[in-house]
């Protein structure tokens, strides 16, 4: 094949790939630099309907795409060059495989004749993401012997699998050189002739209709509704959480809402009060659990569920197993909002009047327990000006201005679960694999998708791990505040039953670093408050304008000591 023909074929295939992805719902593409990916990069950059995002670090790029997909609920494409650039996407792909954000991984590759022969920047990219993707497509090198219809069909099938299952798809694209040259459409007129109707249209080449099961009323629903039950809300959207809470209200059941849901109920702080044996036993009187979504932060609620042996219903739109305790249960794969609405309507349609008297006493007692547990936590946080991780978690949900939230996987997410008041907030997390990598990049992706002010809470080790992604903050389209809780290492390990020397050496790993120079290097406004009120003022001022890094320094081990005292007090208190 003549060089000019290969240039054209590379470019035409890349254009077909990008166009068909757009027709399948892709609106954002995240691109890292590289020569082998030139055909894809040029095709994406010239597409009028795409928003383009760039980053020099492929690991951060993958998490940026994850954040955009998380907030937009759309598939997001990622373009990287060959070699370890591809391998750096694995952490974000592993997360999306568990939490089902739709990533489309377009990885440029060497042609087959340059694999396993000592060629530069060539690794075996086929199957590199293993079971972490829902579908893999290994393309041949662009050739006139492979019809354009074949390419479009395979792309559509990959997108359809993703639409049905969620998660990432991997499309490996081996482009032979050359990549650069003048475009001459006349060279491929005959090759493109069979898809002229597709080119004149705006629909995908193959149009498949996904299977949506109609939500029907659960068997024995009216008997279930008369039981003493509890609604557990896991990692769901705020809209879904509100629908689940409304159903609970119709049933007269308490709501235990995970902070990731953005919903705050009167029975909150259960990760505290479930440490009290009387509360644990009282909750165990329930006869039915309705759980919406999974990925619960609370270990105590997880322990209670492990001991629970009665009727258990789990509702989630995805098909993977979400039952770590291996309970016998009824699983509904359904849209959560629709399921809740259908079952709530059935109660109204039948004009049901339930006798909630048997449930009132224990439900009200747990409500009182929640209030008293929170009061004990507040008393443990000393005075109103003390700035600690505990006092911050107790306050930030109430005092922070309206914005989106991104909460990292450090001690802060557990403190918010225990003591926070995140009510009617859009809360985003990476609680699938729950890694500490890529948190800043994911937060930026969420902000870009929603175009709203965002508050991100991360730990010091997490920020050190994703320091490169501070460069992405300049892409934010609205005010953004990153709060780093600096307890000099892995404070989340403070409660481990390990001697202090080994705990420091192998778990906390103190670093004695602070982040003012990092903020300066990336051109960020930096603040270091000394009091709680000052911290809240800085956060709220930052959410009005600009991009800010706020560092909250607390002594190493302080949170562990406070929590140990609090847990001991909770365990022996009369909470109701």
From Swiss-Prot:
Cofactor note: Binds 1 thiamine pyrophosphate per subunit.
Role according to the record: Catalyzes the thiamine diphosphate-dependent decarboxylation of 2-oxoglutarate and the subsequent addition of the resulting succinic semialdehyde-thiamine pyrophosphate anion to isochorismate to yield 2-succinyl-5-enolpyruvyl-6-hydroxy-3-cyclohexene-1-carboxylate (SEPHCHC).
Classification via Pfam families: TPP_enzyme_C (PF02775), TPP_enzyme_M_2 (PF16582), TPP_enzyme_N (PF02776)
GO biological process, one term: menaquinone biosynthetic process
Family as reported in the entry's similarity comment: Belongs to the TPP enzyme family. MenD subfamily.
EC code: 2.2.1.9
The species this protein was found in: Aliivibrio fischeri (strain ATCC 700601 / ES114)
Biochemical pathway: Quinol/quinone metabolism; 1,4-dihydroxy-2-naphthoate biosynthesis; 1,4-dihydroxy-2-naphthoate from chorismate: step 2/7; Quinol/quinone metabolism; menaquinone biosynthesis
Molecular function per GO: 2-succinyl-5-enolpyruvyl-6-hydroxy-3-cyclohexene-1-carboxylic-acid synthase activity; magnesium ion binding; manganese ion binding; thiamine pyrophosphate binding
Gene assigned in the entry: menD
Name of the protein this chain belongs to: 2-succinyl-5-enolpyruvyl-6-hydroxy-3-cyclohexene-1-carboxylate synthase
Cofactor(s) the protein needs: Mg(2+); Mn(2+); thiamine diphosphate
Keyword Magnesium: yes
PANTHER family: 2-SUCCINYL-5-ENOLPYRUVYL-6-HYDROXY-3-CYCLOHEXENE-1-CARBOXYLATE SYNTHASE, PROTEIN PHYLLO, CHLOROPLASTIC
Reactions that this protein is recorded to catalyse: isochorismate + 2-oxoglutarate + H(+) = 5-enolpyruvoyl-6-hydroxy-2-succinyl-cyclohex-3-ene-1-carboxylate + CO2
Complex formation: Homodimer.
Key words of the record: Magnesium, Manganese, Menaquinone biosynthesis, Metal-binding, Thiamine pyrophosphate, Transferase
């Amino acid at each position: 094949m003549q060089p000019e023909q290969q240039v054209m074929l590379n470019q035409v295939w890349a254009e077909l790939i990008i166009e068909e992805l757009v027709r399948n719902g892709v609106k954002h593409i995240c691109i890292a630099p590289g020569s082998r990916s030139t055909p894809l990069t040029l095709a994406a950059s010239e597409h009028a309907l795409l928003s383009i995002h760039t980053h020099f670090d492929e690991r951060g790029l993958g998490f940026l795409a994850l954040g955009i997909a998380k907030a937009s609920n759309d598939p997001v494409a990622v373009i990287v060059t060959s070699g370890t650039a591809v391998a750096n996407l694995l952490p974000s792909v592993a997360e999306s495989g568990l939490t089902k954000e739709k990533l489309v991984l377009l990885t440029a590759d060497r042609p087959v004749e340059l694999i396993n022969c000592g060629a530069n920047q060539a690794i075996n990219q086929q199957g590199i993401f293993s079971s972490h993707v829902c579908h893999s497509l290994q393309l041949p090198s662009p050739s006139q012997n492979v019809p354009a219809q074949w390419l479009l069909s395979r792309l559509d099938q990959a997108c359809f699998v993703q639409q049905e299952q969620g998660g990432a798809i991997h499309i490996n694209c081996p482009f032979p050189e050359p990549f650069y040259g003048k475009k001459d459409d006349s060279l491929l007129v005959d090759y493109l002739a069979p898809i002229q109707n597709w080119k004149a249209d705006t629909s995908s080449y193959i149009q498949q209709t996904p299977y949506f099961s109609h939500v029907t009323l659960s068997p024995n629903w009216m008997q279930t509704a008369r039981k003493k039950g509890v609604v557990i809300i896991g990692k769901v959207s705020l809209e879904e959480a509100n629908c689940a809470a409304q159903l609970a209200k119709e049933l007269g059941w308490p709501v235990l809402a995970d902070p990731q849901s953005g919903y705050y109920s009167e029975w909150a702080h259960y990760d505290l009060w479930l440490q009290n044996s009387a509360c644990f036993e009282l909750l165990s009187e329930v006869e039915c659990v309705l759980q919406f979504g999974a990925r619960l932060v609370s270990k105590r609620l997880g322990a209670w569920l492990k001991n629970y042996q009665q009727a258990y219903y789990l509702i989630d739109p995805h098909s993977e197993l979400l039952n770590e305790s291996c309970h016998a249960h009824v699983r509904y794969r359904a849209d959560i909002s629709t399921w809740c609405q259908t079952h709530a309507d059935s109660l109204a349609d039948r004009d049901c009047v339930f006798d909630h008297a048997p449930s009132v006493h224990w439900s009200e007692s747990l409500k009182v327990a929640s209030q008293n547990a929170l009061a004990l936590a507040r008393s443990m946080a000393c005075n109103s000006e003390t700035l600690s991780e505990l006092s911050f978690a107790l306050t930030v949900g109430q005092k922070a201005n309206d914005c989106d939230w991104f909460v990292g996987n450090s001690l802060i997410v557990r403190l918010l679960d225990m003591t926070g008041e995140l009510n009617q907030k859009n809360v985003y997390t990476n609680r699938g694999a729950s890694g500490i990598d890529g948190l800043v990049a994911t937060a930026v992706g969420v902000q870009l998708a929603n175009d709203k002010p965002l508050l991100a809470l991360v730990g010091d080790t997490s920020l050190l791990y994703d320091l490169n992604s501070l460069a992405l903050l300049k892409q934010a389209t609205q005010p953004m505040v990153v709060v780093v809780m600096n307890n000099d290492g892995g404070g989340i390990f403070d409660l481990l039953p390990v001697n202090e020397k080994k705990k420091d050496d192998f778990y906390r790993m103190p670093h004695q670093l602070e982040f003012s120079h990092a903020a300066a290097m990336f051109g960020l406004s930096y603040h270091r408050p000394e009091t709680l009120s000052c911290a809240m003022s800085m956060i709220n001022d930052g959410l009005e304008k600009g991009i800010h890094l706020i560092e909250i320094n607390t002594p190493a081990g302080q949170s562990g000591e406070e929590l140990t005292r609090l847990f001991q007090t909770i365990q022996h208190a009369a909470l109701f």
